[in-house]
Amino acid sequence: MDILSKKKFTEINSGKFGITKKIVRKIFKKSILNSTIKGKQLIHSFPINFYIDNKKITDKPIGQICEKFGISCFNLMVDRFCFEALDNCYKKKKISVKGFFDSGVASSISSLTNSEKNQGSVCIDIGSSSSKVVVYLKNKIVYVANIPIGGNDVTLDISKGLEISPESAELAKIIYGTLNLPFNEKIEIDLDSNEKKLISKNLLYGIIKPRYEEILEIIRDNLFDNLYARIGINSIVLTGGASKIFGLENLSEHIFNRKSRIGRIERPDSFFHNKPEFSTLLGLIELAKNYNKYDFATEYLNNKFLTIYDRVENWIEDSYA
């Protein structure tokens, strides 16, 4: 499902008695209601900055005195037809969906540290058919993209290059795949016919590395077209199933000219330790645990005013208590 990201600026008259939590609630609700686009469904709305009389930018508006009070939000939207079709699939099975979340945002929440989010980092989740890119700057999401290229493209290259099935190619990629030049040793690849194919490991390397270079270069070019992303990024965190290949950190540092690491759970006793393919799942768990914090836009747009009021209230209390 394609993601549309769009910044939205909203402004209200605040009077001359100082900004209160009530005014913050008012402007954020107005921002959500004014963010509707025909044919699109809003799934996330992240506050970026508050504006005092169109000049001063602040993260802490409570108590500030001004006549005009503004807010800029970073909104994520999806195609409404696809959204409703997916929602109806669950309803037919009598499954009630509490909320929809962007998988790239979920991966970034589980993979990035608070320090990385503050200093400026990008989380790149390389999946099977797409790569999800999320940029944080000063603890705020400033860029999101979903690029239709991923690990399956590598598998298909191997399948065509070695004239083997995609299943055998995927297995060869997992077992023998590397982005560092290997010794010119011979390896055996299991075929579907219970036979084996003997090839040079260098041949496999020669197929895999160019495709990974292309994937990262496409991501880099899309990323650096955005001024915030190009200037603010200090580090790269790679996650997703296709990030497990040996040597990806070094290749990423070469292409992005930024410090790179593979996203992982730091607890060695955890089942998810060194398993970046579970980053989206772990992020979704975190999102579900903090549902009030991350998702109130959808229910507000569906006219569930009491619920959204409570959620915005919780967000304001947590942020500006």
Question: Can you say where each PLM-predicted feature lies in the sequence?
Answer:
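A conserved active-site cap/scaffold subdomain adjacent to cofactor or substrate pockets
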Residues: 148-170
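Phosphate/pyrophosphate-binding loops at sites that engage ATP/ADP/AMP, CoA/4′-phosphopantetheine
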Residues: 216, 220-235
